[in-house]
Each structure stands twice: as structure tokens, then as C-alpha cells.
Amino acid sequence: MIGWRIGWIVAPATLIPDLALVCMGNVVVPAGIGQEAAAIALEAGDGDVAQATAIWEARRDLILAELDGLPVMRPSGGWSLLIDAGSLNMTGAEMSAALFRDAAIAATPMDGWGIVNGAQFLRFVFANEPVERLRGIGDRVRRALARGRE
């Protein structure tokens, strides 16, 4: 259910109107399929969690190995990682454009995510990428960056 937000907030009643405004901009209305899937996941327990975690860890470890030597922020969990494009004298948006144009790699610049210095970071999501598609991504990234410096 990557990207689908299902949950609740427990807070003092005085904070709820402000939280509702924040959630409106940060959380997409839950799709019916997500609500159904969340209900089933809650009832089924944690049986598949270890298997899913192992798959995501394998993808993470492969992409980290592929991008070795680049300014990557190693994730402790989740299904994405950040590259510090600023240390390569680029913005995240510039690096995103170069990777898309020269290597057919789609990655998200972090300038709109509200983090401090977000414009210097680029996000790679590997959640649903099969290992076969991740293999070789390091060479593709390096070639695209080299083209950008020519």
C-alpha cells in the first residue's frame, strides 16, 4: 500500500481543526481499496511483514551498492533514499532532469517537501522496482551525470 495513507489522529479537540487543514494538504483521501486492504492487514496479523521487509531490504541493499561512491543517504527503513545532489553542484531538480533526459530514470526532487535544504536532494523510490530493473542503475546514473558535465 505504498503511498496510501490510512490511520487516525488522537489529539486535544482544540488541535483537530488545524490538524485537519494539515492533513488535507499532506494526505490524499483514502481510496476504498486502501481502506479494505488496511482492514484485512489488521485482521491478518504480521505474517507477511518479515517477507515484505526482506524484499525491501534486498532492493535497498542493491541500490546502495549500485550507487556506491555517490552522496547517498542510507535509509534505515522505508522504500526510498535520498541523494545529495548539492554535493555534486546540482539542485535536486537539475539532477532529476538530467537523469530523466539522459538515463530514463525518474527520481523526485525534494524542493517541494518542506525539509530544510530540500532543493539539494533527490529521492529514489525502490518500493516496487524489481531487482532486475535496479541492476545497472549506478552505471546509468554515472553516465548521465558525466553527460551533464560535458
Q: Each predicted region: which residue ranges?
A:
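PLP-dependent class I/II
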Residues: 1-150
